[in-house]
A protein has these predicted regions:
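A short small-residue
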Residues: 1-13
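Glycine-rich phosphate-binding/catalytic subdomain of phosphoryl-transfer
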Residues: 12-15, 27-173
Length: 174
C-alpha cells in the first residue's frame, strides 16, 4: 500500500502533524489490504511481518513523558544552514541541512526553549518504529540520516560525537 504525503508550511517550518502521520499509515494499510483482496480475493486479517519506508532525516524531539516537544521538522526545511556550516567546520565532514543533528544544533544555537527538555530525538522512521515496536532504535541506514556513521563499527562516529559534546560544552561556558 501507499499514501501520497504532503507536508505543510506552518510558522516557517515544513511539517506533518502526528495525525497526518498516523492517517497516512492507516491509508497505506487500507490500500495494501484492498490490493490483497483484489489480487488474491482474500481478506487481510493477519500479517506476520510488515515494513514501512519513512523519512530518515528531519527532527522529532521528545521529553521525559515521551511527548513531542515541537512540531516535526521534515527533511524539506532549509533552516539549519548555520548549524550545518559550523558542524562541517568542526567535523571536517559534510552535514546536510536535512540531517537530525543539524536540526538539533540549530535549535541549540537559536536558544530554543524545548532543547533543555529533550530526552530523545529521532527521525520519522525512528518514531514510527518506536511507536509500533516500543523500541527506540534505528537501523544503520536510517541512523546515517541523523549523524555521521563509523562504517567499521556500524555505529555513530565516536570522534564526532565527542566533538559535538565539546562544542556544546564550549557554548555553555561562554
Amino acid at each position: 500500500g501507499s499514501h501520497e504525503w504532503e507536508n505543510r508550511l506552518d510558522n516557517g517550518i515544513w511539517t506533518y502533524t502526528l495525525e497526518d502521520i498516523w492517517g497516512g499509515l492507516q491509508d497505506a494499510y487500507a490500500d495494501m489490504a484492498a490490493d490483497v483482496k483484489k489480487q488474491y480475493d482474500v481478506e487481510l486479517d493477519n500479517i506476520g511481518a510488515i515494513g514501512f519506508s519513512a523519512m530518515m532525516h528531519g527532527y522529532m524531539a521528545f521529553g521525559k513523558e515521551d511527548e513531542l516537544l515541537v512540531p516535526f521538522r521534515t527533511w524539506r526545511n532549509t533552516i539549519t544552514a548555520e548549524a550545518s556550516e559550523k558542524l562541517f567546520k568542526e567535523f571536517n565532514y559534510n552535514i546536510p541541512q536535512r540531517w537530525s543533528i543539524a536540526h538539533l544544533y540549530q535549535a541549540i544555537l537559536n536558544g530554543e526553549e524545548h532543547v533543555k527538555d529533550i530526552t530523545f530525538f529521532t527521525t520519522l522512521a525512528g518514531y514510527i518504529h518506536w511507536q509500533l515496536t516500543g523500541e527506540k532504535n534505528l537501523g544503520i541506514g536510517d541512523a546515517s540520516g541523523m549523524f555521521p556513521i563509523d562504517c567499521s563499527k556500524k555505529d555513530y562516529d565516536e570522534t564526532m560525537v565527542q566533538k559535538f559534546d565539546a562544542l556544546e560544552a564550549d557554548r555553555k561556558s561562554t
